[in-house]
Amino acid sequence: MIGLFKVKEKQREQAQNATRGGASVKKQSAGELRLHKDISELNLPSSCSISFPNGKDDLMNFEVSIKPDDGYYHNGTFVFTFQVSPVYPHEAPKVKCKTKVYHPNIDLEGNVCLNILREDWKPVLNINTVIYGLFHLFTEPNSEDPLNHDAAAVLRDNPKLFETNVRRAMTGGYVGQTFFPRCI
């Protein structure tokens, strides 16, 4: 909460300087303020990291890298883009997987099937919750609510073949007719 007061105080100072002939100041939306708070309070596992490809001035667009330390996706690196709306937290962030991955809950275009990004989103949830949800998809892929129906069927019917397909995809190879770039 103290960080929020500091942000507000800094905004007031900048606004006063602007009225005295200083440079114009962009007013932060409530969504930006909440996101700033969420990011400052992140408590990520060591296998997750966050970066700001557009610089720290663009908090509303960032990337999260997840490197699972166990399970089918062990040692792979998966990058997700986050686009956060100015009305956040009343609207869930838009999340896409930049890494092409053989996964029942992520399709080949990078769309992610995670209930808290859709119908189960609530304003009390935060970026930390979303990142943990994504991390959980790699430790416990879900064949019950798939985007990639082929991968889900293999996971459900033949887990050993699923594991082989995941390894083949992560080391850079074909699964069926689809090529997956190396992500290990």
Curated annotation (Swiss-Prot):
Disulfide bonds: none annotated. Residues 30-175 form the UBC core domain. Accepts the ubiquitin-like protein NEDD8/RUB1 from the ECR1-AXR1 E1 complex and catalyzes its covalent attachment to other proteins. One of its GO terms (molecular function) is NEDD8 transferase activity. InterPro entries: UBQ-conjugat_E2_core, UBQ-conjugating_AS, UBQ-conjugating_enzyme/RWD. Its EC number is 2.3.2.-. Expressed in shoot, root and floral meristems, and in vascular tissues of leaves. This is NEDD8-conjugating enzyme Ubc12. Interacts with RBX1. Reduction in RCE1 levels leads to reduced organ length and defects in gravitropism. Keywords: ATP-binding, Nucleotide-binding, Transferase, Ubl conjugation pathway.
